[in-house]
Amino acid sequence: MFFLLSLQIDIKTESNMGAFHAYDIRGVWGKDWDLDTAYKVGYFIPALLKADKVLVGRDCRVSSDEIHDAVVKGITDAGADVYDIGLSSTPMVYFGTANYGFDASVQITASHNPAEYNGMKVSTTDAQAVGYDAGLGQVKAWIDEGRPTPVSAVRGQVYRKEILADYLAFMRKFVKDLGDLTVAMDLSNGMANLFAKEIFGTDDNIHYLFDTLDGRFPNHEPNPLIEKNCYPLEEKVREVKADVGVIYDGDADRVMFVDEQGRFISPDLMIALMGRYFVGERGLKGKVLQDIRSSKAVGEYLTPMGCEMQTWKVGRAFAAKKLREIDGVWGGELAGHYYFRDFFYSDSGLLASIIILNIVAALKREGKKLSEAVAGIVRYENSGEINYRVEDKQGAMDAVKAHFTAQETPSAFMDFDGYRVEFPDWWFNIRPSNTEPYLRFLCEATTRERLQEKIAEVDSLLSERFGAKR
């Protein structure tokens, strides 16, 4: 079966390119980018990735259907075929790309951003990310220079492809006996609704929140990193006396967790906790990836288990590639992305949640609580990321580095994503936002007093010299 789309698009020479970023294409729909951009990105993907077949999925946002139609028309006008999987989570597209051997794929989504946003995540062979440096920058250049988009003499066709059953079968292999585990699960009105009940069931001990697809996200923004968005889940955990709370973002590539007391758990600590599954249950003592913001406690917990830690840049375009390069077993980021060798070195909110629920169920059988297991990992006081609005980001970063390295000699230094500078009793990371005039600062110390002292120094320095505001 195939069908052809009929879509009228006004092709322009100039296009609003404000949506091209380091990891993907994303911005306010109709303001930062439009149908013209969507069409042209679709048109240039086959040439960029040398693909004659492109897998395409989309999330449930209100604008996703029209973007989908524009992207598909661009791909087929360029002469490539489209395999349309319809509504999908982003990891479903990764699965489809790698499992069925596609050389290119597009997921239409703005992930965790508010409803007025939309975007595209592009992947190539084996679900490898195509970020700005790996090809999206070339697409932008072609659009900027007005490269022609003539319709191919032989237009591509559009085929419907069903992958959900295969995806669920793949994921069910990782589910162990969850026993009488009580779980509260916030689906954020997003794409986790496609699979959560199929995987975790609908028994009375699984309590779902916002379990309908609604691209307006009427209950909260689909971003679990914003504290208030987790309040309903935290309340539900306490109400039903759940053993764990789970919350997905809009496209279900990220997931975060709440303990049985309704307290948010920092995602980097869950990288460490996963050692109970990968090392404790499966005996996999290989390399583990963490981002440059991760607590020192993660490595201090996993290294004695026989794991080798690898620290790297923030963002899927970097993390998934690095995990593949080092043949790592698993990894994660402070933003709630978790990457797995078992999942084509890509991130999956579903697989991460399955693994954590397996761990919590095992803890419960041992008479232990999730909060107790996390307490065995935490060793430091941590600021979390603090955003400073500043125009001269590089100058401000250099000033912070110079200020502290003049006081004492670092015990470790990294400069591949901003700066991470470590001292005997504290460390900090300062890095620029890729999309906004912000510096992101995070520090960790052995005591609360030391932590507050260093934050105060940064506040003062950035305010006085750069006019920075939080």
Give, region by region, the residue ranges found by the protein language model.
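Gly/Ser/Thr-enriched, mixed-charge loops and adjacent short helices
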Residues: 118-240
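Glycine-rich phosphate-binding loop
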Residues: 103-111, 115-117, 237-259, 264, ...
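Proline/glycine-rich low-complexity loops and linkers
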Residues: 137-169, 173, 261-334, 338-340
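An N-terminal, well-structured beta->alpha segment
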Residues: 4-73, 77-79, 158-180
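Phosphate-binding and adjacent anionic-ligand microenvironments
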Residues: 284-442, 448-470
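Short glycine-rich phosphate-binding loop at a beta-alpha junction
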Residues: 53-59, 182-184, 286-292
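N-terminal small/polar loop signature for handling phosphorylated ligands or for N-terminal nucleophile
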Residues: 54-118, 198-258
